[in-house]
Design a protein with these regions (language model features):
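Short, basic/aromatic recognition patches that contact phosphate-bearing ligands
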Residues: 1-57
């Protein structure tokens, strides 16, 4: 899966779910590392996508 496809997939997953979604869940579903998810989230935020999160407790 290319990065653009993965970014779109992340957005679709986040919109479809009503509760919290962890980076670990996204990584597992998209078959990438957690670090890749963090980089992708950062790219989406830099592109102006309003994403908000909290550190896991």
């Amino acid at each position: 899966m290319r990065r653009t496809e993965r970014l779109f997939a992340i957005l679709q997953i986040l919109r479809a779910r009503t509760g919290a979604v962890t980076a670990e869940q996204l990584a597992s579903e998209l078959e990438v590392s957690v670090r890749t998810i963090y980089r992708d989230i950062e790219a989406l935020q830099l592109a102006g996508v309003p994403l908000y999160g909290e550190p896991a407790s």
